[in-house]
Amino acid sequence: GSAIRCGESCLLGKCYTPGCTCDRPICKKN
């Protein structure tokens, strides 16, 4: 299985990657 990557920026406080939450300035895995 492929691991979820949570490296997107979330300056607006929202992550679009499933299973990730915003930890400004980037998304982190739940």
Curated annotation (Swiss-Prot):
Contains 3 disulfide bonds. This is a cyclic peptide. There is a cross-link at residues 1-30 (Cyclopeptide (Gly-Asn)). Keywords: Antibiotic, Antimicrobial, Disulfide bond, Knottin, Plant defense. InterPro entries: Cyclotide, Cyclotide_sf. Expressed in root nodules but not in seed. GO terms for biological process: defense response to bacterium. It holds the Pfam family Cyclotide. Disulfide bonds join 6-20, 10-22, 15-27. The presence of a 'disulfide through disulfide knot' structurally defines this protein as a knottin. Probably participates in a plant defense mechanism. Active against Gram-negative bacterium E.coli ATCC 700926 (MIC=0.5 uM) under low-salt conditions. Not active against Gram-positive bacterium S.aureus ATCC 12600 up to a concentration of 100 uM under low-salt conditions. Exhibits immunomodulatory activity but no cytotoxicity in vitro. Belongs to the cyclotide family. Moebius subfamily. This is Cliotide T20. It comes from Clitoria ternatea (Butterfly pea).
